[in-house]
């Protein structure tokens, strides 16, 4: 493919002075993982909501597969979120149906893309539970009975079961114990490669960014202050703020 999967041009959304983001531009290519890093309040999550069709920007354009995202109907944008895109929330229960079984959470996504045969849907759900290291015998259990790490893995299975082209992740390892984080990152890295996913991941954790991202955007107070290949940005940061971020991690 000789054109970006997602193209963001001069995007702005400011909901208060210094809150939000302004004049952000980047391209995302098929199979590429883009990390967005920066401290809390830098505009990362607001940007993620705008580029994933969940918050209309005030200025700028977003093109997905050469189609203007916000020129589409709201119904078409919702369809993208159900089928070709996935969204992994920091708090997994925000992305799961609490009163629907684990298998049902995965099955709903399959049905959104046209699956109708109950036996096939259940078999695929069981396969994906195993893929994300959840025992298949938990298929009929509610997500609320799972640990935080299992809930996050279930949310990932729900999003990836339809082999989406593009996945948006907001602090997917936030709030998890270090050992649980390590297993989840291992799992994510393997699935990203296996499914050739394009991913935009927001994280404040530079270790997560180094492990998963091909390229980085560094944000400070709503502005992208540095961008480039992950290893270059983290090993040879140019902007004083990026240098500060990297040095603070090294000191810790």
From Swiss-Prot:
Keywords: ATP-binding, Nucleotide-binding, Transport. Residues 6-246 form the ABC transporter domain. PANTHER family: PHOSPHONATES UTILIZATION ATP-BINDING PROTEIN PHNK-RELATED (PTHR42764:SF1). One of its GO terms (cellular component) is carbon phosphorus lyase complex. Signal peptide: none annotated. Gene3D superfamilies: P-loop containing nucleotide triphosphate hydrolases. Coiled coil: none annotated. GO terms for biological process: organic phosphonate catabolic process; organic phosphonate metabolic process; organic phosphonate transport; peptide transport. ATP binds at residues 38-45. The gene is phnK. Belongs to the ABC transporter superfamily. One of its GO terms (molecular function) is ATP binding. The keyword rRNA-binding does not apply. Belongs to an operon involved in alkylphosphonate uptake and C-P lyase. Exact function not known. PhnK is not required for the ribophosphonate triphosphate (RPnTP) synthase reaction. Forms a complex with PhnG, PhnH, PhnI and PhnJ with the suggested composition PhnG(4)H(2)I(2)J(2)K. InterPro entries: AAA+_ATPase, ABC_transporter-like_ATP-bd, ABC_transporter-like_CS, Oligopep_ABC_C, P-loop_NTPase, PhnK. CDD domains: ABC_NikE_OppD_transporters. This is Putative phosphonates utilization ATP-binding protein PhnK. The keyword ATP-binding applies. Pfam families: ABC_tran, oligo_HPY.
């Amino acid at each position: 493919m000789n054109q970006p999967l997602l193209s963001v041009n001069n995007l702005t959304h400011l909901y208060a002075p210094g809150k939000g983001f302004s004049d952000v531009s980047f391209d995302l290519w098929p199979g590429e993982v883009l990390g967005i890093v920066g401290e809390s309040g830098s505009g990362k999550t607001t940007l993620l909501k705008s580029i994933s069709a969940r918050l209309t920007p005030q200025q700028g354009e977003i093109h997905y597969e050469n189609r203007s995202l916000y020129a589409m109907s709201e119904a078409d944008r919702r369809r993208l979120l159900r089928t070709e895109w996935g969204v992994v929330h920091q708090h997994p229960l925000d992305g799961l149906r609490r009163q629907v079984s684990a298998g049902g959470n995965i099955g709903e996504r399959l049905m959104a893309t046209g699956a109708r045969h109950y036996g096939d849907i259940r078999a695929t759900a069981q396969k994906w539970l195993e893929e994300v290291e959840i025992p298949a015998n938990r298929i009929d259990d509610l997500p609320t009975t799972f640990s935080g790490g299992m809930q996050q893995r279930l949310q990932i299975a729900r999003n990836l079961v339809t082999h989406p082209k593009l996945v948006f992740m907001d602090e997917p390892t936030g709030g998890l114990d270090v050992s649980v984080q390590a297993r989840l990152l291992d799992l994510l890295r393997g699935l990203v490669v296996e499914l050739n996913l394009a991913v935009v991941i927001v994280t404040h954790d530079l270790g997560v960014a180094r492990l998963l991202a091909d390229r980085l955007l560094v944000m400070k107070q709503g502005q992208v202050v540095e961008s480039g290949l992950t290893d270059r940005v983290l090993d040879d940061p140019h902007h004083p703020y990026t240098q500060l971020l990297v040095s603070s991690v090294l000191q810790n």
